[in-house]
Amino acid sequence: MIDSRCFAESTINIVSVSGGKDSLAQWILAVENDVPRTTVFADTGHEHSQTMEYLDYLESRLGPVIRVKADFTRRIEGKRKFIAEKWPVSLVEECGMSHEQAAERIAKALEILKPTGNPFLDLCMWKGRFPSTKARFCSLELKHDSVRDKIVLPALEKYDEVILWQGVRAQESPARAALPMWEEDADNTPGLHVYRPILNWTHEDVFALAKRHGIKPNPLYQQGCSRVGCMPCIHARKSELAEIFARWPEEIARVAEWERLVAACSRRGNSTFFPSTHDPRRAEKRIEVVTVEEYGIASYRDWAMTTRGGSQYDLLAATNDKTVCSSVYAGVCE
């Protein structure tokens, strides 16, 4: 049952989709119930190509999707100015570099730090680092703010009520279990509300709804992925990272190249996709000794492919048939 407020006069529902199972379930619900809506996808530039192809498939089945992308051109220009003006002093006084070393680092940063048009890469180069568990700025900058600025704010000027649909479920985490199904005047914004229609659904429920409508799951779910947004996500499980190394080494190579670019835009020149403590056996907290070569994403292959705390190579994983479905969710391979 859809909340009746979603059908009120001068109301528009904004259904955010990602190519994942949960956003698909709420999208199907909106279509089933003929909810007045705008469907939107925030392109982060860090999705797998199969997810982008899957989004095209969903659009052919469920209707049009507005695609939005964050733009960091102005902020990158601001950082270039900051580097030119502030780094000559801070690199020497705070990072212990000589004036010659500082000049070399600054020249390299200014050579690299230019907009690429890829939101995720541009964000990380502007920040001089990758997102982390404690600094998860990716979702805010690439999804929340982009949808707010390009979809929500214009909608608030046109409609009395704007309802943001969020495909989150209580089963996912204690934090999400504590969320309400409806939030009035979200972000202290009159007329802006958040609705979570599948909050109490299970994994099985969301897959069953799609199956009932004859809609295929994102193929990444059948290839060992528990998440199908960013490839890889900073929260990727060890087993999931192993699948990525085995199935899509080109994605690892792409991120490794991004590490080189982002590191060049950081003061110490050593920004890595995963923190240097990711592998417990060689965890390093001394930031001054961390290098991209030693702790970049490519260095985690052996760790990802091992069991027993990283001490035993997983021969079964190495020889698995990658054409066979290996979903972590029950029922997906049926």
Swiss-Prot record:
User: InterPro entries, from UniProt?
Assistant: PAPS_reduct_dom, Rossmann-like_a/b/a_fold, Sulfate_adenylyltrnsfr_sub2
How is this protein named in the record?
A: Uncharacterized 37.8 kDa protein in gpa 5'region
Q: What is the lineage of its organism?
A: Viruses, Duplodnaviria, Heunggongvirae, Uroviricota, Caudoviricetes
The answer to whether UniProt assigns keyword Transferase to this entry is no
Tagged with keyword Oxidoreductase: yes
User: Which keywords describe this protein according to UniProt?
Assistant: Oxidoreductase
User: What family does the entry list?
Assistant: Belongs to the PAPS reductase family.
* Xref: Pfam families: PAPS_reduct
Molecular function via GO: oxidoreductase activity
PANTHER family reported in the protein's UniProt record = PHOSPHOADENOSINE PHOSPHOSULFATE REDUCTASE, SULFATE ADENYLYLTRANSFERASE SUBUNIT 2
